[in-house]
Amino acid sequence: MDCQMILNAMESDYAGSTIRQTYMTMGTFFKSAKDNGFIDRHPMDGVRYTKPVRAVDDIHFLTVDEQKRFLEAAKGSHNYAQYALILETGLRTGEMIGLTWDAIDWEKRTLTVNKTLEFRYKQDEWRAGPPKTESSYRTIPLTDTAYGILREIYDTREYRNESNGLSTVLTFMDRKTGQKRKLVMRDLVFINWRTGMPAKNSSYDTHLYKLCDDAGIKRFCMHALRHTYATRAIESGMQPKVLQKLLGHASITTTMNRYVHVTDDSMKEGVAQFAKAQEAQKG
């Protein structure tokens, strides 16, 4: 087994943090195998990964003002609903692209995350898969705004352009059950009105850059919308444990350290609340 080749192949499709975790898992696995006499040589000796892990401070999120300016610039654009939905639910990009109508319960006003979809450029194909981790399987209560976004798309779906590619049925292994599942492309919520197919992952970022320029704000990528959702949730008073479940994190540490950001406004508000409490104690 060429462990270096495996890590090198991951660099085009996976984040540095994922590659690092794979590197560590492989190292632990083979060390145990060697220690127990199953193999003579540790296959990870001399193996390195080069893709850097993005620092927490590099992760961007929008201020309240930037969020308003961005949404204003995005109004009327073909991807507005997708951007707005992530800001209301905290979905990952692949979870949003892979969202199908059967995952939405109109009566309970919930959205269930149970699959993902992404375009693999190296293989030139769409690939369905399970959510990122077992904790990523979750059911999210919909805000009125999120419900309205989805309802409008559902009520007008018969007018959308549909490509022959929507007849494609993709299969993937369900992480929770170990059984094969199907994703029917025609059942996807978000279909590009022009192409009749779902928009590819990278096309969202390209479109975002133009909207950022139009709004006069710093450019950001799709994942920043998820970070922004988390930050707004904490600012609104949501309990971190609740946010952890909504984001699909196994650990509260991930939620707090990576996705929750302290803004200047929230610091000022915190100090003001502290000062008010101090004055009240003085009588």
Enumerate the language-model features and the residues they cover.
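Short, contiguous acidic/charged loop-to-helix segments that flank catalytic cores in large enzymes
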Residues: 127-137, 191-200, 216-224, 262
